[in-house]
């Protein structure tokens, strides 16, 4: 068994134990029982790796929270942050700045179709909140259609629009949110037939009244709820259904955008232009917080002669906009879209090999460098290795093995993710998957005979 690598590092001000103790004493960890949290202390990061204060190295196989797309501490982005901070950190959103102007123009050039107006936020949840507010203002309608297997952010409205169990404790939430089934049902290996998927959507629209629905908010490729990739024809049919009823289509690309699937935005794989597109995470590769709502011309023009219904102190934050510009330049100049396609093919091939080798792997899914393993006790029944919204000894042991071996990824319910930074090399990709290969021996032992 290969041990995780350890480096001798200059001693920081705090040890790892001190970091953990003080963080747990004085700060809250999200979505977690505070007495059970066991965070990894992080002192520095570079490329696809990060290190503890004591020098233990981890391969970041999840790009932190699917956001560090260009890797850690990229010198070009660090320099852009330093340069902008020395010149102008902040100007209020009623002013004009060069980074804001240049970023708006740049996003207009890379977004699908005629999306060319942007409202900047602090992150993905705020982007989705503002997108539905815009949709309601433009259409004069109130209802927002979403899907069950989804996550749209941690603010009040975004959580209401979220389908997964993180919304439960906030219910009833904001009014007007209606839910439709996902194209890939929980506990099944494959998506539903296309005709059945569209029929489900048509039923919800019929029962709720298409004339009452302002927007359909959807993750183009569903992220934390399973890396669910829409079947061919689905996005086109959704676009046609929205057009038929005058419903605005909002593509949540917070996680799937900026090269993660091998395109600037995942929706480009299916040749569909949404009315609005939301983004964050890879927009700055999480170096500085920034999100955005992109709007097609007809949506943006609705506010030419009336007030735009939103505002934030940090809207169009100067330092964040400069960071985004530098990040986008890295994607372009280093060919990271092509890199995601090339290495995504290698990732998919090795994931399928591991699926064949290990009986506990019920399914693997990936598009670009956006992937997931689904772990089961029985391939015939697709019984999950851990229950919906729950844990199991086997999945806990698998996560502990990854951590011991220096592989960082997200283990959730009966799944774990393969979402490395786009700058990963083929050798580094195999390094991570070799650890996965050994770890799956743990879950294989729990497979029913």
Q: Whereabouts are the PLM-identified features?
A:
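Conserved N-terminal phosphate-binding loop of PLP-dependent enzymes in the Aspartate aminotransferase
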Residues: 2-449
């Amino acid at each position: 068994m290969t041990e995780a690598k350890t480096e001798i590092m200059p001693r920081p001000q705090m040890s790892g134990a001190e970091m953990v103790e003080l963080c747990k004493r004085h700060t809250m960890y999200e979505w977690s029982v505070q007495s059970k949290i066991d965070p990894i202390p992080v002192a520095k990061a570079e490329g696809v790796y990060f290190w503890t204060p004591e020098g233990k190295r981890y391969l970041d196989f999840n790009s932190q929270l699917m956001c560090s797309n260009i890797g850690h501490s990229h010198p070009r982005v660090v320099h852009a942050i330093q340069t902008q901070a020395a010149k102008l950190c902040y100007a209020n959103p009623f002013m004009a700045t060069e980074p804001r102007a240049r970023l708006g123009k740049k996003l207009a050039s890379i977004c699908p179709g005629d999306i060319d107006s942007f409202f900047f936020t602090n992150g993905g949840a705020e982007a989705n909140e503002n997108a539905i507010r815009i949709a309601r203002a433009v259409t004069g309608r109130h209802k927002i259609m979403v899907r069950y297997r989804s996550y749209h952010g941690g603010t009040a409205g975004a959580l209401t629009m979220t389908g997964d169990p993180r919304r439960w404790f906030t219910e009833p939430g904001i009014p007007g949110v209606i839910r439709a089934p996902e194209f890939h049902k929980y506990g099944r290996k494959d998506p539903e037939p296309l005709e059945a998927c569209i029929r489900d959507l048509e039923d919800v629209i019929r029962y709720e009244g298409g004339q009452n629905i302002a927007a359909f908010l959807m993750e183009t490729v569903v992220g934390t709820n399973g890396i669910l990739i829409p079947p061919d024809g689905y996005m086109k049919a959704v676009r046609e259904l929205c057009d038929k009823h005058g419903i605005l289509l909002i593509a949540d690309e917070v996680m799937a955008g900026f090269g993660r699937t091998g395109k600037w935005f995942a929706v480009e794989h299916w040749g569909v232009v949404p009315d609005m597109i939301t983004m964050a995470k890879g927009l700055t590769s999480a170096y500085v917080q920034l999100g955005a709502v992109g709007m097609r011309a007809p949506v943006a023009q609705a506010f030419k002669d009336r007030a735009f219904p939103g505002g934030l102190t940090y809207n169009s934050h100067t330092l964040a906009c400069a960071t985004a510009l530098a990040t986008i330049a890295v994607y372009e100049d280093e060919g990271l879209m092509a890199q995601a396609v090339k290495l995504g093919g290698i990732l998919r091939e090795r994931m399928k090999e591991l699926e064949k080798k290990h009986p506990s792997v019920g399914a693997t899914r990936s598009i670009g460098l956006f992937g997931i393993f689904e772990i089961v006790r029985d391939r015939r029944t697709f019984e999950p290795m851990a229950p919906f919204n729950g844990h199991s000894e086997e999945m806990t042991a698998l996560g502990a093995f990854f951590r011991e071996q220096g592989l960082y990824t997200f283990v959730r319910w009966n799944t774990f993710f393969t979402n490395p930074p786009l700058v990963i090399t083929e050798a580094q990709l195999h390094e991570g998957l070799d650890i996965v290969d050994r770890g799956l021996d743990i879950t294989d032992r729990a497979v029913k005979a």
